[in-house]
Swiss-Prot record:
Pathway: Amino-acid biosynthesis; L-threonine biosynthesis; L-threonine from L-aspartate: step 4/5. GO terms for molecular function: ATP binding; homoserine kinase activity. Belongs to the GHMP kinase family. Homoserine kinase subfamily. GO terms for cellular component: cytoplasm. It comes from Clavibacter michiganensis subsp. michiganensis (strain NCPPB 382). This is Homoserine kinase. It is found in: Cytoplasm. The keyword Signal does not apply. Its main location: cytoplasm. The lineage of its organism: Bacteria, Bacillati, Actinomycetota, Actinomycetes, Micrococcales. GO terms for biological process: threonine biosynthetic process. ATP binds at residues 96-106.
């Protein structure tokens, strides 16, 4: 079927990085961070897709229809029975890949948001559909929810599908992300999880997860106690020993440090902006490997899409 979208129709998308789990909130809590991938998508009059990747991943990720962003666009068009037009994409990537900062979720959300903008006026895609589509591709909503909606998100799945609740983060929370050179496969990290955990550990994490929500939205001084975990971080230590050692070192020194997502990046949640610098200095002093310190804000908007050109003629 021929696409009815006008040739030259162009949308611009911005998607934030995310950090999932935040210590105790395994597969549930996620935080949007002010570090962004930008995407421009233009409808062309020839079939297929081209992708110009700039920044992170340039020369490494696919530049054709197998690119994850293109796959997400196609998934969304198919979900609403819309023919896929030919597309030219320009991806300006800043989110590190394979570091536990939601890069794959950001790519998926970028594609879905681009499809929403391209189809605006033809098909209206609401927030529930955005989350459902993203979760279908990512497999779980803890990263895609904050990428879509910003802020702190609680994500869960019930009989109606994936759900989320967005919460505003206390302005005193100052995230620091420490990014190593090494990468980590999410699949590998998940494979290290045991099939069951002791009952007391489950209770421990339930209490800390509840406390963490309170700490992030109103009581940042509780962040150190609130970010304790017994469900996943130590089980994955063998795959990222230095990350695990640095988490324990930072916590011993009073910093609310956790593994970001599946790792191997570190996330430090401070109530004092000055703590970020001293935490970064401590890691630089103790590690023989380079770590990049990113002093970020919490993103409050989530993903955005804007139609910047309506185009001129129907695409072939």
């Amino acid at each position: 079927m021929r696409s009815a979208l006008a040739t030259g129709r162009r949308v611009q998308v911005r998607v934030p990085a995310t950090s999932a789990n935040l210590g105790p909130g395994f597969d549930t809590l996620g935080l949007a961070l002010a570090l962004y991938d930008d995407l421009t998508v233009t409808v062309r009059d020839a079939p297929g897709a081209t992708v110009d990747v700039r920044g992170v991943g340039a020369g490494e990720v696919p530049t054709d229809e197998t690119n994850l962003v293109v796959t997400a666009i196609a998934h969304t068009f198919a979900a609403f029975d819309q023919p896929m037009p030919g597309l030219d994409l320009v991806a300006e990537n800043r989110i590190p890949h394979g570091r536990g900062l939601g890069s794959s979720g950001a790519a998926i959300v970028s594609g879905i948001m681009a499809a929403q903008g391209l189809l605006a006026g033809t098909v209206e895609i609401d927030a529930d559909a955005l989350l459902r589509l993203a979760t279908e591709m990512e497999g779980h909503p803890d990263n895609v929810a904050p990428a879509l909606f910003g802020g702190l998100t609680i994500a869960w799945v019930d009989g109606q599908g994936p759900q989320h609740k967005k919460l505003a983060v206390h302005r005193g929370v100052s995230p620091l992300v420490l990014v190593p050179v090494a990468t980590m496969s999410t699949a590998l990290a998940r494979s290290l999880q045991p099939e069951s955990v002791p009952h007391e550990d489950a209770i421990f994490n339930v209490s800390r997860s509840a406390l963490l929500i309170a700490a992030l939205i109103q009581s940042p001084e509780l962040l150190l106690a609130a970010t304790e975990d017994r469900l996943h971080q130590d089980y994955r230590a063998a795959a990222m020993p230095e990350t695990n050692e640095l988490v324990h070192l930072l916590r011993e020194r009073g910093y609310a440090a956790v593994v970001s997502g599946a790792g191997p990046s570190l996330l430090v949640l401070g109530s004092d902006p000055g703590q970020r610098l001293t935490a970064a200095e401590l890691v630089a002093e103790r590690s023989t490997n380079p770590w990049t310190a990113l002093m970020l804000a919490v993103d409050v908007k989530g993903s955005t899409v804007q139609v910047v050109d309506e185009g001129s003629a129907p695409a072939a």
